[in-house]
Amino acid sequence: MTISILPGIAAIAEAYDGFVLDLWGVIHDGHNPYPDAVDCLTRLHGAGLGKDPGQGHSASKRIVMLSNAPRRSHGVIAAMVTMGIDRALYDHVVTSGELTWQALKARSDPWHAALGRRCLHIGPERDHGLFEGLDLTLVGKPEEAEFIVNTGPWRDEEQLEDYMPLLQAAATHRLPMICANPDLEVIRGGVRIICAGTLAAYYASLGAPVRYHGKPYGEAYEACLAAMGLSDRARIVAIGDSLITDIKGAANAGIATLLVTSGIHADELGLAYGDHPNPARLEQACARHAIMPQAAVAAFRW
């Protein structure tokens, strides 16, 4: 399969009514928006405004941000405002943290209902907002806990090896773990750091039970589609930088995919920000991961 490499988002803007946009690696780098991102988002938001939809198509673009941030949606919105990303430029934000919070609040399925109330949080203090309003008691040791919420390493410089003793101890107690960020790693300000998904994968390898919320799992995309209010999946595209979360998840949900190549796979592809990808090298990388997007673009630019 040949992957089309597009000059920018304008090339597909008219083909779709709904856009599911990844944040980290597409819109921003964890600290600042990418050079072209705000301009592109502004143009995309305005691309359908005031037009006659015709044939059942939407008169304005539906834009939903889908992030594996282990924080609630309102916190991610506030962070984007701080970065200078106007709240008026998109419709909704769905985060893995919000999905986690909703699942723990509702406890409407047997797995979550059985978790208990004593929780060991693996993750930095900045993620504590995830527990507000949940009637949980946070504890500090596996032997005190009934389950684990994993939002990632306590410090960016830490590696999996730093957590192996803790995770091994938790596994002996068969503590269920919720992974509130399935990403394995992320690049923050040019530095590659591990995410909660790396810790969860190791914990699962010990035979311990793990439940994931976020991409690439189906509930994340169903939440986006519900927020959009669009029924025709052929008119929806997901734009992301990770083959194993963004592209895989969207493909499984039956929506089109566009890979941004200057994100998490940039080193693998030998690219700096905005570099045009080599088609053969891109297809080789996709083959290694056994995931093929319909198209690719160097950066989220118009």
Where are these regions (language model features)?
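Intrinsically disordered, low-complexity terminal tails and inter-domain linkers enriched
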Residues: 47-59
